[in-house]
Regions:
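N-terminal strand-loop element at the rim of the active site
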Residues: 8-16, 28, 32-83, 179, ...
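A conserved mid-protein helix/loop that constitutes part of the nucleotide-sugar donor-binding site
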Residues: 16-24, 207, 211-233, 240, ...
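Short His-centered aromatic/hydrophobic patch
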Residues: 88-92, 110-116, 134
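A short, active-site helix/loop in glycosyltransferases that binds the activated sugar's phosphate group
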Residues: 155-180, 187
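Aromatic "clamp/platform" in nucleotide-sugar-dependent glycosyltransferases that forms part
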Residues: 270, 289
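Short hydrophobic beta-strand element within catalytic cores of glycosyltransferases
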Residues: 306-310
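Conserved acidic donor-binding segment of nucleotide-sugar-dependent glycosyltransferases
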Residues: 322-334, 343-349
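A short, well-ordered alpha-helix in the C-terminal region of glycosyltransferases
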Residues: 336, 350-365
Length: 380
């Protein structure tokens, strides 16, 4: 029997959680069955640093350009990053169309810069089936709504990372309901985490809470730093470590100084292995304005790190609130956040164990194995 060929399309400027999801998804199919031949498309050289990992996992990597022009594109700022995405769109249009037409993969799963393959599939009659993967919470404006109403007619399926996003798209009524599927992201690689969790290059003697993510408006770390001035009054022996990188780094440092928290709040550059930090933290705080589902939230849950999360759409509500897997505060609400901090301070061991166990159970749908099994069923 002929192997099914699956292509992944997900160009990116900076390494975000979606990149990990793409590689893990491709890997999950390879692990699930040898009947799948899986290829990641490299539009501009963005996957170059991931080549060894991709090949080690027996995933093919197909370059669409001989030049790694990703190195010359601006990566931060709304206007400059959108300009970079536009350039990738223009430079990849004909190479992507040619590859799909000539190679004729059975499926192409599209994660980022999805407008390009959506337009190609709308205007050209191709044998390949296109699956749109919703990566992150879809913010709808009239232009995207209009665009999706037109181009989604040619899409084979749309997979949603949470039930909340599934229900949201269903209510919008922009596509046949039969095309919508819930497919949880492959966030938890159990074997990999077990290997990495004890490898720690930095050690902290003090008790600390931890927050992890890109330094962007979405992650809302400025709110957390401002709030931590009050947290210190409630729990004087608790420090805060924020791990990540991004365009708001200078703003966050300025906010720390403004609140005179230099001795209590530390910023660490992006860490490839965050599991030891989660393992030793007293709690994980997620102050985000939106997440779908929230990769690091699930990694914290798997590491048995007590979760204090905002109630932002969509993932945290489904993971933390619905599963009783931690403490949840009203997003961007200082008073409610401080109430949850006081509740955290007064938790007894039985409550802590209950939250941690529920959080661990909530991780099950997000393992590589579960994702691979469910994606295999979708493709067959």
């Amino acid at each position: 029997m002929k192997n099914k060929t699956i292509y992944y399309w997900s160009p990116f400027l900076t390494e975000i959680a979606t990149v990990k999801a793409v590689i893990n998804s491709a890997y999950s199919l390879r692990k699930m069955s040898e009947d799948f031949e899986v290829t990641i498309l490299d539009a501009a050289g963005e996957f170059k640093k991931k080549t060894s990992e991709i090949l080690q996992k027996k995933i093919n990597l197909l370059k669409l350009s001989n030049i790694d022009y990703i190195n010359f594109l601006p990566k931060h700022g709304k206007i400059l990053s959108r300009l970079s995405f536009f350039l990738i769109f223009i430079c990849s249009f004909f190479p992507l169309k040619k590859v799909i037409k000539n190679k004729q993969p059975d499926f192409i799963i599209i994660h980022l810069i999805t407008s390009l393959p959506l337009i190609i599939f709308y205007f050209f009659n191709l044998k390949t089936k296109c699956i749109l993967r919703i990566s992150g919470y879809p913010k709808m404006n009239w232009l995207r709504l209009f665009f999706w109403r037109i181009v989604l007619k040619k899409v084979y399926l749309i997979t949603c990372p949470t039930k909340g996003t599934y229900n949201y798209l269903k209510e919008l009524d922009i596509v046949n309901e039969n095309k919508l599927k819930v497919l949880y992201d492959p966030i938890i690689n159990v074997n990999e985490i077990l290997k990495e969790k004890n490898k720690q290059s930095l050690k902290f003697e003090k008790n600390y809470a931890i927050a992890i993510g890109r330094f962007t408006e979405q992650k809302n770390f400025e709110f957390l730093i401002n709030a931590f001035k009050s947290v210190v009054k409630e729990i004087p022996n608790l420090d805060l470590i924020i791990v990540g990188k991004g365009e708001q780094k200078k703003l966050l440092i300025k906010t720390i100084r403004k609140n005179q928290l230099e001795d209590k709040v530390k910023i660490l550059e992006y860490q490839k292995n965050i599991f030891p930090f989660l393992k030793n933290a007293k709690c994980f705080i997620l102050p985000s304005l939106w997440e779908d589902p929230g990769f690091v939230l699930l990694e914290a849950a798997f590491m048995r790190c007590l979760i204090i999360s905002s109630d932002c759409q969509n993932g945290p509500k489904e993971i933390v609130e619905d599963k009783n897997a931690g403490l949840m505060f009203n997003s961007n609400n200082l008073n409610d956040f401080l109430e949850k901090i006081i509740e955290f301070k007064n938790l007894d061991n039985s409550d802590i164990k209950k939250y941690k166990l529920n959080a661990l159970k909530a991780c099950r749908p997000f393992t590589i194995f579960t994702h691979g099994k469910n994606l295999k069923n979708i493709l067959q």
